[in-house]
Amino acid sequence: MVRYDPEKYAAVADNFVYVHRALRRDLSRIIEGGAELFERDFPRFARILAKHTELEDSLFFPALEERAPGSTTMTTAPHQEIESLAAALVAEDSGGDPSERLRALQELLVAHLREEEELVMPAMMEHFEAAEIWALDGRIMEFCPPEFMQEMLPWWFTHIDAEDRVAVAQNMAVGVPSEVLPVLCQWISAGLDEAEWGALVARVPALTSGAV
């Protein structure tokens, strides 16, 4: 079992572990839910996937390429193929069964996310100090308008398990400006039921600043 520096792992985990898990779980749920669920929820999934790809292509990967040229080259073609397939599924208006193309997307996405976790994430930890990764992470809001965050945060916390929620919330509690945290907490709580939110706040008391 590979052991990583815990500070560096915490810094990269939001983007390369916890978002990846949510993407896998939500796509599986949509596939299993049939046509009605696809029509309702896949457009949101596609928007969040597109923003995740944009953040990697515009923020994290260029920084890594400066330190380790060629280390993200393997992501270019999969990003393009996955985004093209997702966009085509959103644009589809024939009313046909999307299940075959959804499973093709799932196969591509799962393989690609695994590749990033096995190759890109370790490279980030090798070539950056934890503080440098946190600094990159702190720039995410430059790429994400408030309306996107209001949609993404409830989605994210819905599709990760209780332990992952705690890890992400702890990162937010120490990394997000104090004046911003209450708003993020309100958006997160909107995606959880009362018991789930209460359990999370009990583990991460700083979230009470955003309780409603």
Predicted regions and their residues:
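Small-residue-biased structural context
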Residues: 1-212
